[in-house]
């Protein structure tokens, strides 16, 4: 998670939770048209009205705090079936599930890994890949998503 994403998470967690939702994570994607993507969840699931409510709340906070200096589009959504993973708690919660990882720095000459989350120990996760346990530092994970099975 980038410094900006950490700052945004700290700034937006309380307003999102005040509406009764969990702030799952934040992604800021820089580009010609930058995007601030906010993932929310609740025990009852998420619908379009929930996303609109959070979008209005987040917009109000962002207008006051103004932490992003470039133009951007705001997207609020549920994590979906291919839920992104942002924290050690997410990996712990989904132990036993399949995850796809993209690493910042290669491990064994690979940046992309897919396997079953076996364990979480502090800032390290163990993933079983093709029958072998591999250990990754959370700080080295650039992107992680659950792999849905239909």
From Swiss-Prot:
InterPro entries: Ribosome_maturation_RimP, RimP_C, RimP_C_sf, RimP_N, RimP_N_sf. Gene3D superfamilies: Ribosome maturation factor RimP, C-terminal domain, RimP-like superfamily, N-terminal. Disulfide bonds: none annotated. It is found in: Cytoplasm. It comes from the Bacteria. Its main location: cytoplasm. SUPFAM superfamilies: YhbC-like, C-terminal domain, YhbC-like, N-terminal domain. GO terms for cellular component: cytosol. Pfam families: DUF150_C, RimP_N. Keywords: Cytoplasm, Ribosome biogenesis. GO terms for biological process: ribosomal small subunit assembly; translation. Belongs to the RimP family. NCBIfam families: PRK00092.1-1 (NF000927). Required for maturation of 30S ribosomal subunits. This is Ribosome maturation factor RimP. It comes from Klebsiella pneumoniae subsp. pneumoniae (strain ATCC 700721 / MGH 78578). The lineage of its organism: Bacteria, Pseudomonadati, Pseudomonadota, Gammaproteobacteria, Enterobacterales. The gene is rimP.
